[in-house]
């Protein structure tokens, strides 16, 4: 895995080739989205978020857990769509029987709209996506405390007394930092419940097809997004940065870059591509 990007203050590593493997790593947060074939760097992430059950996104899951155990690392916490949680549990039971190993991990099923705190100042929420099997994306939020307006300017000792007396002196500021779509049609863009996805600081989204080698209708039929639809909805993206992933293996890196270079002015300077492996 050679590609390492730094976007909006976050280091991003990974590989994503449509139909082969997808794993996107944010080492600053010790988390990965999808596990693909379990690239080595993924093993060192404590939290793993799975978008859906296709093998190019979940195939490396047993290896991820087994390798962490081999390295005497803390059992990871793995998040999956609640619809496939039982199947994932059975998957681990089979591998435990075959390999006679413990495969220690914490498995959490999340439904769309449910959230989980991975740190007291970081939470992750599942959002609705539109693939051909049960799927969901994830939004990572940062939480910060800000002194309420009515207490701004008060002496420090008065603020301290208010706090000790049980008065709530701060407001919680919730900011969407990162959104990851997994596999989905462009329908997620116009879903009004996904407003935070389109205003996250960084949006990592699939873009399986980038030119007329495949039609928009073909992309929709197989649960994917075409670059033409991203262009269609250009004004809806409020993100500071958009990282396009999951390009079809039919493309070469230069074809991807050329297609993206033709994006309208609305995307200028904020669209990146992950072309590791192309």
Positions of PLM-derived features:
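Conserved beta-strand hairpin/beta-sheet module of binuclear metal-dependent hydrolase folds
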Residues: 1-46, 138-140, 146, 170-181, ...
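Active-site-proximal loop/helix segment associated with metal-binding centers of metalloenzymes
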Residues: 17, 122-198, 202-207, 212
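Active-site neighborhood of phospho(di)ester-bond hydrolases with catalytic His/Asp-centered motifs
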Residues: 33-36, 45-56, 80-81, 179-184, ...
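Active-site metal-binding motif and surrounding structural segment of the metallo-beta-lactamase
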Residues: 36-81, 109
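Short loop/helix-cap segments at secondary-structure boundaries that form the rim of catalytic
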Residues: 39-44, 116-119, 197, 212-213
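Metal-dependent catalytic neighborhoods of phosphoester/phosphodiester hydrolases
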Residues: 60-67, 93, 252-261
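Active-site neighborhood of divalent metal-dependent phosphoester bond hydrolases
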Residues: 74-76, 83-109, 250-252
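Binuclear metal-ion centers of metallo-dependent hydrolases, dominated by the metallo-beta-lactamase
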Residues: 106-114, 188-278
């Amino acid at each position: 895995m050679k590609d390492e990007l730094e976007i909006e203050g976050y280091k991003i590593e990974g590989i994503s080739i449509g139909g082969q493997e997808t794993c996107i790593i944010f080492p600053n947060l010790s988390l990965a989205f999808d596990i693909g074939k379990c690239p080595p760097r993924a093993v060192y992430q404590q939290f793993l978020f799975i978008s859906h059950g296709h093998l190019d996104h979940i195939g490396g899951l047993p290896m991820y857990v087994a390798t962490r155990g081999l390295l005497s690392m803390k059992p990871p916490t793995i998040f999956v769509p609640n619809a496939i949680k039982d199947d994932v549990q059975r998957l681990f039971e089979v591998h435990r029987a075959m390999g006679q190993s413990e495969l220690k991990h914490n498995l959490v099923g999340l439904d769309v709209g449910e959230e989980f705190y991975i740190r007291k100042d970081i939470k992750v929420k599942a959002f609705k996506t539109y693939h051909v099997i049960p799927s969901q994306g994830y939004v990572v939020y940062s939480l910060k405390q800000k002194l309420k307006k009515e207490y701004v300017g008060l002496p420090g000792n008065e603020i301290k007394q208010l706090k000790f007396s049980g008065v709530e002196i701060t407001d919680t500021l919730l900011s969407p930092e990162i959104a990851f779509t997994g596999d989905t049609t462009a329908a997620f863009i116009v879903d009004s419940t996904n407003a935070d996805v389109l205003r996250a600081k960084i949006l990592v989204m699939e873009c399986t097809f980038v030119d007329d080698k495949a039609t928009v209708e073909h992309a929709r039929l197989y649960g994917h997004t075409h670059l033409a639809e991203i262009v269609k909805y250009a004004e809806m993206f409020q993100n500071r940065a958009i990282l396009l992933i999951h390009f079809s293996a039919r493309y070469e890196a230069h074809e991807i870059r050329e297609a993206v270079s033709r994006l309208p002015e609305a995307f200028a300077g904020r669209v990146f591509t992950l072309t590791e492996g192309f």
